Amino acid sequence: MKLKISLLLAFFLYLTVIPLSGQYVIKGRVSDAKNGDPIPFASVGLVGVSQGATTNFQGEFTLNSKYSADSLFASFIGYKKRVKKIKNGSLFQEIDFQLAPTDQVMAEVKVYSGENPAFSVLRGVVRNREKNDRSKLTAYEYDSYSKMELDVDNISEKFREKKVMKDISQSIDKFEKIAGEDGKLVIPTYISESIGKFYYLENPQRKKETITKTNIKGVGVKDGSIISQLVGGNLVANYNFYQNYVGFFGKDFASPIGDNWKDHYNYFLGDTVNVDGHICYKMDFDPKNPMDLVFRGQMWIDTTSFALVQIDASVEKGANLNFIEKIKISQELEQTSSGAWLPARTRFLIDLEEITKASAGMLLKMYISNKDIVVNKPHPLGFYDVASEVAEDAMKPDPAFWKYARHEPLTTSDLLASALIDSVQNLPIVRTYVEIAELVVSGHRRFNGLEAGPYITSFAINKVEGARFRLGFRTNANFNKNWILRGNVGFGTKDLVTKYALEVNYLFSNKKWTMAGIRHSYDLERVGLTPDLIGDNKLFYAFTRWGAFSGAFFRRESEAFFTSELSKGITLTTSLNTRSFDPLFRFQFRLNPELGTASEVQDHYQETFATVELRIAKNVTFLMNGNERIALATKRFPMITLKYQHGFKGFLGGDFTYDRFTLKAYQTFRLGSLGRSDYTFTAGYTPSNLPAPLLFPHLGNETFFFVRSAYSTMSYFEFVSDRFASIQYNHNFDGLLFNRIPLIKKFKWRLIASGNILMGSQRVENREIMKDVNNPLRSKFLDRYTFDSLDPNKPFAEVGYGIDNIFKILRIQAFHRLSYLDHGNPRRFRIMASVNFSF
């Protein structure tokens, strides 16, 4: 009887436990507690039971178990392990984990016999790079879906006390707050999604992205024109770890599978795992010097092809970077029909630290999903001319389109972020902060279609004008997409002269960038410091308006111009100008220097000239900003400008017939762990006989503000040439030296060095034009300048060195003048400063 009861009890347990055991299902998501970013390949398991699962690229997991347990754990390298209780008797549960980052460093691995087993795998990766790297492809393209989100995080107590935060908190109290389990509030300020296609051509290298639809919502986002060109993400986040260095923020980060992998990383080879059907080596990598620009993380290498299948790489706070709490790149790659691997999914995260205790941090998250990959089918070269194209109806709402076109549905967090932005962006205090931010960034205050500014040039005090007041304006695309107006008016309290400028442009095409316009202006300028010589450095130009204002002259100028992009990266500009020169210093020249003292003397002049300029910028990418365009710097090739000018005597009052030729080449390039460099080569020549201001006055710098294009130990208009060649070279070593010096390395300083060499001369005929001329009409002016020439056999040279990144924004440089040390009152040694915002 007892045996029957025992058998019956056992049979009952079999019927109740065993069938139900197959129905225990636990689903969930593992994410970073600080920023909400998913954690791929995290381990999830039942406590006390040898059964578990790993998360996918989205950080999601599904655990099916025959056994029950009272708790579930989640763990991943670089994060604190977390355990949660399981509801007893529940057959289906959802449990999410938020793992807190830890500062732990990978334990040292000692190999007592033979080499590290990871090294043979890495050599296999390098050996098979040519067949696995996407660079072997002549071209590729794919459908792409991307999401981008910008949040405010790390909200300090002082920042919470600000009125803007109190108003925001009241607005979002009705919503469920977006936060991790650590309770830290995250406030979304911008969210976008886009869908389109990405095209790549290897030789010559071209990138093109077309945006079919985009959905943008953000605090302060008034016009999505330029933002819509960036939301695709492939133009800025197309990372390739097969290259020796992965570049972003103008920095080079050593790849863990690059040629120099052994110099930068420690490696630990783990077990083999299955990743989407590929049996892979799991490998951890850790920086040898945490301050270097390197990664920490894990990667999965295919055991057959030695291809990179997936990587999870982070740059942490200890690296020599500014304002960065963390950078994280997760990439999942897919093999194409050609054998090369392309990214199927990419996650990119930047966590910016709070700059002060009274501020907050920022969090940028980007996700890109690619599918329907086509390889080795290049389009005609002209197809790639426009780097970013946005469909005319791209921003038109279309819920039905998004429902079927998204590669995956929006998450609950995405939907909540969108609702929060709608609530926050209409607050008056938020709109005020947005307007202040726009003013700081652009220098202009927007009033719908009109923008006032730039404010940096609105006021100055100098000895000629007294207090100078200036008000400027420009129109934007809200005024008119084709017509562009600019102008300003100024007045000096001492000279009592009104200055003004007006410009009218018409944009014929923004694809081939074809524009025509006219300008007219009357203003007080300085020899060698005019806007056409200084360029776009508005800060330096504003500084030159203050103080003694030596070399001053009034200029009246009229110009008509036409510019057009002939082909990708090649722009032609033609113009006709008439320009006067009326100096406020003792200035005279001989109209006919061959007559010597018998020549007629003149103290002012007028020139009429035509200009043809050809600019070649290979591989440059342009983005449209309304009716303006912004150039993203070309990397591998120099930007070259060729200019020819011809003066017409007797036409529109011109006093001279002349020819001028100039050549300028500028290039910036990165040298991996050695830092980054840039150089500017400039040359000019005129065969004509002209007064000094019409030759080539070399740009000196008498301020304490460093200007890259100026000679730091040269005075204003100290030297003038009718033929010259110069090279200006700058190099930033980043943390190459200071990262290795104890005590100093904690400051994250960066060593910089520079050198400038100028060769030039003046022909005798040009020196005779202004030699020993004494015009009593100009005797009332005390200032007189010799406009000396350089010795053709003796270059002007100066060298500089200094420290960058002092307090994260300040650069201090020392300059030594190496030649012309007995010329006048030379500036042999100078200390200069500049503000430099960089990561």
Predicted regions and their residues:
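Extracellular beta-sheet/turn segments enriched in Thr/Pro/Gly and aliphatic residues
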Residues: 87-113
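A short, solvent-exposed loop/turn motif at the edges and junctions
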Residues: 46-48, 71-84
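Hydrophobic beta-strand segments
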Residues: 42-46, 72, 111, 142, ...
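Short Pro-Gly-centered beta-turn/loop motif in secreted/extracellular proteins
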Residues: 36-40, 62-69
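Structural motif
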Residues: 23-25, 29-39
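Short, acidic Ser/Thr/Gly-rich low-complexity loop/linker segments typical of extracellular
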Residues: 50-60
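Structured extracytoplasmic
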Residues: 103-104, 112-280, 286-294, 356-453, ...
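Exposed, low-structure sequence patches enriched in small/polar residues
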Residues: 10, 247, 253, 385-839
